[in-house]
Regions:
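Generic hydrophobic, amphipathic alpha-helix propensity
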Residues: 9-19, 35, 60-64, 68, ...
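Hydrophobic/aromatic residues within well-ordered alpha-helical segments
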Residues: 10, 53, 60, 64, ...
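Solvent-exposed, amphipathic alpha-helical segments
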Residues: 13, 17-25, 71, 75-78, ...
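Helix-turn-helix
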Residues: 13, 21-59
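Hydrophobic alpha-helical connector segments
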Residues: 70-110, 157-160
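Hydrophobic/aromatic-rich alpha-helical bundle segments in the mid-to-C-terminal region
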Residues: 126-131, 146-193
Length: 193
């Protein structure tokens, strides 16, 4: 299972490729052939380094999630020295919940993300990963709010996340061209200055 440096690099290239495909096209885009082609590796490498497509997909989700958490942590550290405006906090929270790709507005990035989140419920192999990563996201969100003098407990945090999710789902149902803007408006009203 690839214990060598070369093997580790190849495995990581497959994970990177699968994560890119996941971001671009959701779970349906993560296929052995597509991942191998994106990574520039032979098709057989996907089954050599991963026992199943589910294992590869799980590695892609974890890789993407950890990268987003690391980016969120860096942004929080960068913003710590800046003036503390509610709008900055809201954008950070929305990046963590909706993904930075949603910043440019538009329906597609948010729709794809929510399809992936809801679709995870149909992929039981992702449940342990999602459960294990949720506290990390909650911790970063809680710390973000606290640094902006808006301390919340876990129940309050879950209500804010549900508020964002509700605003986004309503916007998606209505084919709103900018669901992030709808979530921004609701979140600003909830935590405003």
């Amino acid at each position: 299972m690839g214990g060598t440096s070369k093997g580790e690099r190849r495995r990581q290239a497959l994970v990177d490729a699968a994560a890119e495909l996941l971001r671009e096209g959701g779970f349906d885009a993560v296929r052995h052939r597509a991942v191998a082609e994106r990574a520039g590796l032979p098709l057989a490498s996907t089954t050599y380094y991963f026992g199943s497509l589910e294992e590869l997909g799980c590695a892609a989700v974890e890789h993407s999630s950890r990268a987003e958490l690391a980016t969120g942590r860096r942004r929080l550290d960068e913003l710590a020295s800046a003036p503390r405006a509610a709008a900055e906090l809201v954008e950070l929270v929305l990046d963590l919940l909706l993904g930075a790709e949603s910043r440019g507005g538009g329906l597609d990035a948010v729709l794809l993300r929510y399809e992936q989140l809801v679709g995870a419920g149909r992929r039981p192999y992702l449940a342990p990963l999602m459960r294990s990563m949720r506290p990390e996201l909650d911790e970063l969100l809680t710390e973000s709010l606290a640094r902006y003098d808006r301390a919340v407990d876990l129940d309050e945090l879950r209500r804010l996340v549900a508020l964002v999710d509700g605003a986004v789902v309503s916007a998606l149902i209505e084919a709103d061209p900018d669901p992030r803007a709808a979530a921004r408006q609701m979140l600003l009203a909830a935590i405003g200055d």
